[in-house]
Amino acid sequence: MNGRYYTADRGDVVDFLRSHGPFNLALDIGCAAGRLGKQLREAGIVNSCDGIEPHPAAAGMAAGQLRRVWNRDLADALSETPWLDYDLVILADVLEHLVDPWQTLRDIHDRARPGARLMVSVPNVRHKSVVFPLLFHGRFDYVDAGIMDRTHLHFFTPASLRRTVEARGWKVRAESLNIKKKYRKWWFPHRLLGPFLAVQCFLLAEK
């Protein structure tokens, strides 16, 4: 198990959701060791959080942080999960790893209760670190971590993420870009070049 990945700080997700809560009960899909759920609870954004995590060791760690954890692949957990209990479903850097993220978004939509919110974050393949090597050198190289992580099966831009989510029945309510602080100091490049400077894109949708 990559301990760094499974225990990573998710303050970025907390910051995005801070102005959209509070929520009663969240479901964190791909919850890793449960750190995000713990952070959301401590920040007062959710009252409680459940998780789905396929990796046994990570699921065991998450069980100590979350109310309930299913050690299952998402496809196997679909029928076991009490979807109507959740007013927030989280897919934080998960879609890019799934074989069929489109069907996953549809399955969750069909099972979620009316008014439930879906939070999605994905790496932004429009980032300059990907675009410039591709444009000027024809390079599209996979690496061990980051936007071009070799475990990523799919790639999204802010615009394609929105279209993907909306096409599966969700109504997008909020969007944001994760831009490094050094770029946020200047209004002009931040506003004009945001899609090229953001390492991640965030989205909140409603059923």
Which residue ranges define each predicted feature?
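Conserved N-terminal segment of class I S-adenosyl-L-methionine
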Residues: 1-84, 88, 102-105, 122, ...
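Adenine-nucleotide cofactor-binding loop residues
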Residues: 75, 95, 126
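A short beta-strand submotif of the Rossmann-like class I SAM-dependent methyltransferase core
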Residues: 88-94
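Short N-terminal helix/helix-N-cap motif within the alpha/beta-hydrolase-1
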Residues: 99-103, 130
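A short glycine-rich, Lys/Arg-flanked "PGG" loop and its adjoining helix->strand segment in the class I
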Residues: 103-117
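Conserved class I S-adenosyl-L-methionine
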Residues: 120-141
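Acceptor-substrate binding/catalytic loop of class I
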Residues: 143-160
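Substrate-binding/catalytic lobe of Class I Rossmann-like enzymes that use SAM or dcSAM, i.e.
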Residues: 162-170
